[in-house]
Swiss-Prot record:
InterPro entries: Phosphoglycerate_kinase, Phosphoglycerate_kinase_CS, Phosphoglycerate_kinase_N, Phosphoglycerate_kinase_sf
Chain positions recorded as ATP binding sites: 197, 314, 340-343
GO biological process, one term: glycolytic process
Organism from which the protein derives: Aeromonas hydrophila subsp. hydrophila (strain ATCC 7966 / DSM 30187 / BCRC 13018 / CCUG 14551 / JCM 1027 / KCTC 2358 / NCIMB 9240 / NCTC 8049)
Domain of life: Bacteria
Subunit field text: Monomer.
Catalytic activity: (2R)-3-phosphoglycerate + ATP = (2R)-3-phospho-glyceroyl phosphate + ADP
Record-given protein name: Phosphoglycerate kinase
A Pfam family recorded for this sequence: PGK
Known pathway: Carbohydrate degradation; glycolysis; pyruvate from D-glyceraldehyde 3-phosphate: step 2/5
PROSITE patterns documented for this protein: PGLYCERATE_KINASE
Length: 387
């Protein structure tokens, strides 16, 4: 992937606009989870060290376009940045006609979704963003799959458009896992439905040496192998699709499962062979034999891509399968990349964040890359790099 990188540019005295992903949860005017801001801090610090006249913008929540709404203001993010950077940070509300920034100063441009034309990516708005800067830096991988004014349009018209360190790192890690994987490559895909992950499964079936399926997705494959899945979440209309994927790909067969009578935190868990599942059972996790077999596969891998838990890990009695998988990934010397909201929650629960080679910041963008789709905000950077 050939893009201009911010790290290679001289930013001294230049007006630099960074599109970051600062879409963080806020409660009572305070940031409640700072992961995305923390991920962006090295980019901000580097630009300031390089002497840039620095502006940064992001969306936050889903406000009505064209209307200011304090609930979705970036003010709490500004307060957080002041503390984190130990320097003054200004919030600019009306900035589309220009904003004064000194070298080494940071100005946060208010929620870009307050601007009319942001989501539709109107040329008028894109040109206004572009006029604010000498260098545009796209550093929000989480929104790279959306062609919006602040992610795509501005990159068309800015004098220079480049990738920030976070975006460049994300593309490098995904490229390493998907485009040039060291083999054997194992992909783990969990989640509740085959239908929502079908393109991911089809794409990975062409790349992975072994494709591990978990969660509700696995139930459809268990049914496709001719077993009873009782009252479990299962897409019976996709059994033929599962059979086709199983025939074309090396998908390890689940041999035992953990079942319960109902979806509840207090329902007792019972380990059963897949052959013994009854009409009243609901499958909520893989059993210990299956988990051990998958852990062995993971330990022999050279590349691991993980998207989605293999059981209802939020309930402790159905968490063991995902825990075993997580610990195997943590112990494996392979290059590992993980992405998707539930996956990140599982990584947090089992405390393995520092043992995964790369944790992707993008949910939808991560999946679209894995599906082999073009990410518009990356495509425009590649186009500009060629020009």
């Amino acid at each position: 992937m050939s893009v201009i990188k911010m790290t290679d540019l001289d930013l001294a005295g230049k007006r630099v606009l960074i599109r970051a992903d600062l879409n963080v949860p806020v409660k009572d005017g305070k940031v409640t989870s700072d992961a995305r801001i923390v991920a962006t801090l090295p980019t901000i610090k580097l630009a300031l060290e390089k002497g840039a006249k620095l502006m940064i913008t992001s969306h936050l929540g889903r406000p009505t376009e064209g209307e200011y709404n304090e609930e979705f203001s970036l003010a709490p993010v500004v307060n957080y940045l002041k503390d984190a950077l130990s320097c003054p940070v200004r919030l600019a509300k009306d900035y589309l006609d220009g904003v004064e920034v000194a070298a080494g100063e940071l100005v946060v441009l208010e929620n870009c979704r307050f601007n009319k034309g942001e989501k539709k990516n109107t040329e008028e708005l894109a040109k206004k963003y572009a006029a604010l800067c000498d260098v545009f830096v796209m550093d929000a991988f989480g929104t790279a799959h959306r062609a919006e004014g602040s992610t795509y349009g501005v990159a068309q018209f800015a004098p220079v458009a480049c990738a920030g360190p976070l975006l460049a790192g994300e593309l490098e890690a995904l490229g390493k896992a998907m485009l040039k994987p060291e083999r054997p490559m194992v992909a783990i895909v969990g989640g509740s439905k085959v239908s929502t992950k079908l393109t991911v499964l089809e794409s990975l079936s062409k790349i992975a040496d072994q494709l591990v399926v978990g969660g509700g997705i696995a139930n459809t494959f268990i049914a496709a192998a001719g077993h009873n899945v009782g009252k479990s979440l299962c897409e019976h209309d996709l059994i033929d699709t599962a059979k086709k994927l199983a025939a074309e790909t090396n998908i390890p067969v689940t041999t035992d499962v953990v079942v319960g009578a109902e979806f509840s935190e207090s329902t007792p868990a019972t380990i059963k062979s897949v052959a013994d599942v009854t009409d009243g059972d609901m499958i909520f996790d893989i059993g210990p034999d299956s988990a051990k077999a998958l852990a062995d596969i993971i330990m022999n891998a050279k590349t691991i891509l993980w998207n989605g838990p293999v059981g209802v890990f939020e309930f402790d009695q159905f968490a063991e399968g995902t825990k075993v998988i997580a610990e195997a990934i943590a112990a494996s010397p392979a290059f590992s990349i993980a992405g998707g909201g539930d996956t990140l929650a599982a990584i947090d629960k089992f405390g393995i964040a520092d043992k995964v080679s790369y944790i992707s910041t993008g949910g939808g963008a991560f999946l679209e890359f894995v599906e082999g789709k073009v990410l518009p905000a990356v495509a425009i950077l590649e186009q500009r790099a060629k020009a």
